[in-house]
Amino acid sequence: MALSMYHYIENTWNSEEWKKSVLRQRLIKWRKEPSIVRLAKPTRLNRARSLGYKAKQGFVIVRVRVRRGGLNKPRPNKGRRPKRMGVYGYSPAKGYRWIAEERAARKYPNLEVLGSYYVGEDGLYKYYEIVMVDPSHPVIKSDPKHKWLQDPSNRNRVFRGLTSAGKKVRGLRKSRGLKGTVRYKWNRKQKEREEKKRHEASKYYKLQEYDKIPGK
């Protein structure tokens, strides 16, 4: 069976030699450009097509740049130790990809976010490409695969966590549900602490033959 074009695109993208040569030059160019840029065509065609992208009217590709780290945390103007300022060491509750989708949706309020994918990162930023659709375009209205975006229940879907990035952060992936998320594990461990049970991170957690755990 012959391999498809998308197979070779994926192999090229995962090649370390290609990342050091081509992608590095692209990142240098992207850093000089604005944070939100509309593109003529997707950088990763295989990922865009997997999200439902079609090369026809009504589809728009946008590249969004998001700063890495804890983003902008307001620094308190009242007196306290710098250690207690609460500025450093905190990560945003949302994923970077979800943040990028929301920024693209605010930039183009007449479009709806269909999906997004990662395209690169450097020491300061992460870059994502957002697949957006114009639900009012006649081509989209007549497309049976994408006319569902006209429904009022799908309006501003990115701000309600209905995209893939939003569902991932909310722990709503169909493959696992809420039971495998970080929030679920934290709540479970917190309940064990309150009930004074053996914590799963304990060194002697699996040593059931001991009546008394050493050091406790």
From Swiss-Prot:
Signal peptide as annotated in the record: none
GO biological process, one term: cytoplasmic translation
Domain of life: Archaea
GO cellular component: cytosolic large ribosomal subunit
One Pfam family it belongs to: Ribosomal_L15e
Record has Ribonucleoprotein as a keyword: yes
Keyword match Transferase: no
Annotated keywords: Ribonucleoprotein, Ribosomal protein
GO molecular function: RNA binding; structural constituent of ribosome
Matching InterPro entries: Rbsml_eL15_core_dom_sf, Ribosomal_eL15, Ribosomal_eL15_arc, Ribosomal_eL15_CS, Ribosomal_uL23/eL15/eS24_sf
Similarity comment text for this entry: Belongs to the eukaryotic ribosomal protein eL15 family.
Protein name: Large ribosomal subunit protein eL15
Protein species of origin: Saccharolobus solfataricus (strain ATCC 35092 / DSM 1617 / JCM 11322 / P2) (Sulfolobus solfataricus)
Gene behind the chain: rpl15e
